[in-house]
Amino acid sequence: DDQIRANADSNWSLDKDASTFVTNQLLLKRDIDWNSTFFKTGVWGTDLTGVASGVGAGEFLQWNDSASDPIVQFASLQTDFVEQSGRKANTLVLGARTITALKNHPDIIDRIKYTQRGVVTTDLLASLFDVERILVSYATVGSGAEINDAADQDAGTTYSFMSDSKSALLCYTPSSPSLMTPAAGYTFTWNGYLAGNGYGIRMKRFRM
């Protein structure tokens, strides 16, 4: 509003900050939609569940257990993926606690201990799991009623990871997307039909 603009050190910076804030909120909404729609069971062809013990059909030993073998498991999943789809999985999406468990797994640490840095990174994990890239979901969201008091608002807000932090998604995403190229999913924008940038966002200024 006019008071905030009058108190700003630079009007140009204020416009930029406002645009960045609104854009981030829109992208956050897109992340929320993706997580609630796709980063869950019942959507993809194969669902596996990590268990603490007594592994049965469709289950595996949780990766925070030193007796588990995520490297062999991913190799098997990759083979199954190629057999069922004709394409090699190249993208692995991990929850925040999943990446922590994998980085501290003794088998993985043993495999990379003679590398240049001896530190488990997402690049090294990608090589071990034979994928091109690993994406980690660290986004968080706050939930709670809006309260017109900073202290009460903070006390009444609960923060959590947007994604299931103990989940993983192995999928195929092409480097050159198109309507005729299969992929785990697409988000298209209709260029020339609606104004906006590549994310389908456009900016408009108005007085408040």
Kindly give the residue locations of the regions a language model identified.
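Alpha-helical scaffold segments that mediate packing/assembly in large oligomeric complexes
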Residues: D2-K88, A96-R111
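Sequence/fold signature of self-assembling virion shell proteins
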Residues: L14, G56-D69, I109-M208
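Short, surface-exposed beta-edge/turn micro-motifs
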Residues: K88-T91, K166-A168
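A structural signal for short, well-ordered beta-strand segments and their strand-loop junctions
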Residues: T91-G95, L135-S137
